[in-house]
């Protein structure tokens, strides 16, 4: 196993979550999955491991990242781009016919109708020819691949960011468009012939659950199996660090590894890898020092300017998915909780929130807090 802190891991570098991959694969036999959690907890690594497993079971699997998409056509473009190489595979049955049909659908994608921000219910035609509603074209794309013999897994990364982009860029109809997107996914897709051949793994580093609750559309995701990635147990985290140390010939006892886990406090693989990276660097600079004597310095390096970008990113996500006022409230509560390693009691957080919200009643503050 290699010391990789940041990039998704595969093969021998994937450690400690084999049982989770097996459980997700089992769920996908009958249900679609919503996998949410902050950045750097291994969602992409797990999703790709699931893709590998279902392929071994005879499925086809594609991955699309929609974080850069600002509208529904962007989603369709990503879907088409991911399908093209998969359908050009020589092992695909009737690939030529399906590929030709996909090409025709690609031309339709260029002319789908999407709402024009600020224009109310009016749409805009993109490209030449008659414009269609994007949901019709999307449904035809999915129906096309469902005609093939194999089952399909479509892994969509950062879908919540696309939906937040719709709302941010279209203050007039953005919420309606998000509702339509999620209704299409829940109802239209499931109603397609052979829909059982299509399974979806949706992931994101911002809260889709938060978005739908805020806008009164929680029902749109109730058909998804909600899953998360818990941190490693102490035993698994220690085993990972000891294996890493063996790879790099660094003397590290189980006790030393346990001290690292205790210092990290939230032993997600990334933070263990990042701490080990800094520990390796310090050992290289101080070859006579023991690993145990350098653990505290390695932890300090995690939060030094330039190395703490991931923590700033979390703060940015709050601003992205919450209103300015609610994001400020959230930061205030986090600052209060961070004063003590054991956190803060809900009553203390609620009292601080009531003070910040001024004229709000206790019940209004409680609803915001929840």
PLM segments and residue spans:
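Walker A/P-loop-proximal flanking segment of P-loop NTPase domains
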Residues: 1-54
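Winged-helix-like regulatory helical subdomains adjacent to P-loop NTPase cores
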Residues: 254, 263-364
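P-loop NTPase nucleotide-binding core
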Residues: 31-41, 45-171, 363-367
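A short helix-turn-beta junction within AAA+ P-loop NTPase domains corresponding to the substrate/partner-engaging
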Residues: 214-231
